[in-house]
Amino acid sequence: MKHFLNFIGGDFVATGKTFENRAPVDNRVLGLVHEAGQREVDAAVAAAHRALKGDWGRMSVVKRAELLHAVADEINRRFDEFLQAEMADTGKPHSLASHIDIPRGAANFKVFADIVKNAPTESFQMTTPVP
């Protein structure tokens, strides 16, 4: 059975609590989702803070935008894989998922990368609170 893990700090993380992900069309089990609890949320927040203080925080806005465009390109490259997963997970028909959901997922990465890259940075400058 497929396990859907949390991705925290560059690693896939299993948890002690899972639930079945069932296809809405026929109720078959698609896999087990590892539910994030307080420990996983805290670990994800700590990993985000480390990334902000590390390479990601030192990376230029242009480079970050390039990486987000690369994510969009990878979604498009693996279009059929994402399409099959979306249809199984949501029960949406091929016509809807292939013309709206997957293209929009890829487009969102590009749009927000371009907005940040092309917007005046002074409107986004702020201190990130550290616990």
Regions found by a protein language model. Name each.
Residues 1-131:
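N-terminal Rossmann-like NAD(P)+-binding subdomain of aldehyde/semialdehyde dehydrogenases
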